[in-house]
Amino acid sequence: MVSVLVVGYKAFDLGIFGDKDQRLKIIKAAIRRDLIYLLENGMKWLVFTGNLGFEVWVLEVAKELQEEYNFQLATIFIFENQGENWNEANQEKLANFKNVDFIKYAYPSYENPSQFRTYNQFLLESTDGAYLFYDEENETKLKYLYRMMKENKQYHIKKLTFDDLNEMAENFSEI
């Protein structure tokens, strides 16, 4: 996978309401492990959609890894006004998504529901695969994008699972 779409749970989906949550250490350790694997297997681009939660944590780890690895970061927002109503702390996270190698907006603003499907299709057509933190047993609106990913047999999916995190937590004292 040369270009990898990053999508996953939002922080509130996981009950994480602050940057000091201890679970983030384990999540970020797992992200670091997975990104190194992807980088060592040819990844050149990480593509974000600008959502809070998993994408923020991947972006933070990726920016650290850019000191050691040569790869690019892109954010393709669905709307130009995405995040304009976020609080100050989240505005900083939005600014980080805009401080990448490539930024694009799919639409100026929301007009109709079909924009979401078209946007998801564009993301899948523009990337080779995805780095995904999602579990079908804990559904969110990500289920639609995940379903589209699975329908394309050529689309590669690298998943971070709750089992991965549990295993990482068991070994965390060694990290």
UniProtKB/Swiss-Prot annotation:
Domain of life of the organism encoding this protein: Bacteria
InterPro entries in the cross-refs: YspA
Membrane-spanning ranges: none
Pfam families recorded: YpsA (PF06908)
Family: Belongs to the UPF0398 family.
NCBIfam families: PRK13660.1
Record protein name field: UPF0398 protein SGO_0588
Organism: Streptococcus gordonii (strain Challis / ATCC 35105 / BCRC 15272 / CH1 / DL1 / V288)
Lineage, opening ranks: Bacteria, Bacillati, Bacillota, Bacilli, Lactobacillales
